[in-house]
From Swiss-Prot:
Belongs to the pro/parathymosin family. It comes from Mus musculus (Mouse). Parathymosin may mediate immune function by blocking the effect of prothymosin alpha which confers resistance to certain opportunistic infections. This is Parathymosin. The keyword Cytoplasm does not apply. It holds the Pfam family Prothymosin. Keywords: Acetylation, Immunity, Phosphoprotein. InterPro entries: Pro/parathymosin. Residues 38-74 have a biased composition (Acidic residues). The gene is Ptms.
Amino acid sequence: MSEKSVEAAAELSAKDLKEKKDKVEEKAGRKERKKEVVEEEENGAEEEEEETAEDGEDDDEGDEEDEEEEEEDEGPVRKRTAEEEDEADPKRQKTENGASA
């Protein structure tokens, strides 16, 4: 009878080890992805700084273009119709009493 309990314990521990290994691998994968995202953000910021430094003379012209784009975006604000609201956010559905679900 002791042989069966030893085998069961060995199987159980192997199963536990496999589950633990899977969890560790998942956690390591998440950390790696997070690290990559942080590196990408840092690299993106460095690239923007380099571009700004290289474009020294063109900097004034770019500002004027940016201001023109901003002015176009700031046009008169109008209220959306109910149809446009539904199209803009199709995930929202209204319940019978009118509240969002």
